[in-house]
Amino acid sequence: MITDKNDKINKIIVKIKNKLLILGFHSLNLILIIFYLYPGSLFGCYLYNNCNIQPQITGNFIVSFNYSIASNHFYVFFILSALGIFAYQNTKKIKFIIIYLLLLSIILELLHIIIPLRAFEWGDLFGNILGVIFVIIIYKIKGKYVQN
């Protein structure tokens, strides 16, 4: 009797957790698209009263003297991908989500070519893609070694 009640409570908790993950993924996805397509930096406008300045969470990841990978882009796409992949991990939509995240990471950066006050940068693109790929690797490792 008690275990039946505990099972029901655990199922409800899992459903709520999944709903919150899905809501978080879609909310962050919408916010990311708005921030990416805005001409200039909304954070720069707010923090520095200058829409041309992009705040940095940490310094970029340096690959060589001439090249770096944008850390901000890595962090944002890592978080978005983690929410999306782990929200949909036990559904038929997981492959779609992975493809969507990879395409989103590429398309949003390519759109900077035509958006005023924005510029396409290879380091940003690689930061986006690496954020997604790192979460995919974590998801694959989790699936191999951890029982749901």
How would you name each of these model-derived features?
Residues 2-125, 129, 133-146:
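Bulky hydrophobic segments
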